[in-house]
Amino acid sequence: MGKSETIAEGKDRYQAGVIPYKKMGYWEPDYQPKDTDIIAMFRITPQPGVDPEEAAAAVAGESSTATWTVVWTDRLTDCELYRAKAYRADLVPNTGEGTKNEAQYFAYIAYDLDLFEPGSIANLTASIIGNVFGFKAVKALRLEDMRIPVAYLKTFQGPATGVVVERERLDKFGRPLLGATTKPKLGLSGRNYGRVVYEALKGGLDFVKDDENINSQPFMHWRDRFLYCMEAVNKASAATGEVKGHYLNVTAATMEDMYERAEFAKSLGSVIIMIDLVVGYTAIQSMAKWARKNDMILHLHRAGNSTYSRQKNHGMNFRVICKWMRMAGVDHIHAGTVVGKLEGDPLMIKGFYDTLLDSHTPTSLEHGLFFDQDWASLNKVMPVASGGIHAGQMHQLIQYLGEDVILQFGGGTIGHPQGIQAGAVANRVALEAMILARNEGRDYVKEGPQILQDAAKWCSPLKAALDTWKDVTFNYESTDTADFVPTATASV
């Protein structure tokens, strides 16, 4: 690691015109991050011929105080305080000379807390990811992880409800919650949509949800959907004696429309509303604030996240989104299934779940966690597992994801050959059988298939589900995997 080559204040600096970022003070290998610093860890692929330390300094500069040339107004402020400081650039394992992959570097950059507006995800992201991803000095850039200091976390409200209070409201403890996404997600009339909701809840699910792109279309106005869904929720609750819910998607074109829809959902007695990630950070924080004020659970669908999280060398890791959304104040977020149809390496998904559920998340390189993170008493976020899962995978889902999770069987409920209610029954019986086996001390992972077969002897819907989907899985290689086993590389 090279030493600092900063050109000091004075004639040499201000007559230099354009000087490398490394010499402008943005590369400080001797810097010791303060407890109050925000630290971002980027995966940098420098352009050919660009020194990795210069690339790291360029990212630090362009994400804080720098522009492309020296400016005289630097002398009117405390640049030494406000400059971001790149202090490490470590070669990523299995890249560079002697490998088939071009060289990539993990660059650690520290930002003074005063650079950011308190309690604003929008302002935080405007600096960290606002301009640097199009910078010519880097061929590719990915934000892998961040350490958020307690001093900054305390300026955010965090989840409006949290896992503990949600379980108390539902009176459901010791097991994952069960849900489903209404299918087909587009095209149903309001009445038929409500019927799907009723059948699924009556069969034993705790929740049903709108999908990300059901808002207010010609085939079903949002108000009709809300009315029919809440009628279904109330009837199912009365029939089963259990607390039920439906995630009413209030995503809309404007904040005024979103507030109107949320208020209407509340007036109908809904306990939960839903928004999509694509509404943006300000809208998410605004709805989280509304949800806390109005005693509502806020579900976030991560619609759009893979446009920037899927590729390993460019964009942003989903674990960063998990951190930001916990700060922003959502109660639920889709975080992967491991065994379903969507991208998800088991180790990476474990890191996502730990980020959402831990009070303190320790460094764990095998799970992609590069920093110790104290969550400053922010409530936990309930992870949601959805996409290509079915009753035959119940033992695997509990093994990988634990019990603080919402398992959403959309096609695995509504695609059941005996009907929607039978699909819900199959999932509920499979879950109860697996939890009972776990609580009895059985090796439910090894014995899982047999446990399900035994339960299916007394439950025809579960037998039909197992016969229909058998051992269907989606075994594709993940694009986002751990880079190394634990080493000293990630120590701050």
From Swiss-Prot:
UniProt-listed GO biological process terms: reductive pentose-phosphate cycle
Needed cofactors: Mg(2+)
Residues given in the record as Mg(2+) binding sites: 209, 211-212
Catalytic activity, EC: 4.1.1.39
Residues annotated as the enzyme's active site: 183, 301
Residues at the site labelled Transition state stabilizer: 341
Catalyses which reaction(s): 2 (2R)-3-phosphoglycerate + 2 H(+) = D-ribulose 1,5-bisphosphate + CO2 + H2O; D-ribulose 1,5-bisphosphate + O2 = 2-phosphoglycolate + (2R)-3-phosphoglycerate + 2 H(+)
Residues with PTM N6-carboxylysine: 209
Main EC class the enzyme belongs to: lyase
Disulfide cross-links: none
Keywords carried by this UniProt record: Calvin cycle, Carbon dioxide fixation, Lyase, Magnesium, Metal-binding, Monooxygenase, Oxidoreductase
Gene3D superfamilies per the UniProt record, alphabetical: Ribulose bisphosphate carboxylase, large subunit, C-terminal domain, RuBisCO large subunit, N-terminal domain
Gene Ontology molecular function, alphabetical: magnesium ion binding; monooxygenase activity; ribulose-bisphosphate carboxylase activity
Entry similarity comment: Belongs to the RuBisCO large chain family. Type I subfamily.
PANTHER family: RIBULOSE BISPHOSPHATE CARBOXYLASE (PTHR42704), RIBULOSE BISPHOSPHATE CARBOXYLASE LARGE CHAIN (PTHR42704:SF17)
Function (record text): RuBisCO catalyzes two reactions: the carboxylation of D-ribulose 1,5-bisphosphate, the primary event in carbon dioxide fixation, as well as the oxidative fragmentation of the pentose substrate. Both reactions occur simultaneously and in competition at the same active site.
Subunit structure: Heterohexadecamer of 8 large chains and 8 small chains.
Protein name per the record: Ribulose bisphosphate carboxylase large chain
Organism field: Nitrosococcus oceani (strain ATCC 19707 / BCRC 17464 / JCM 30415 / NCIMB 11848 / C-107)
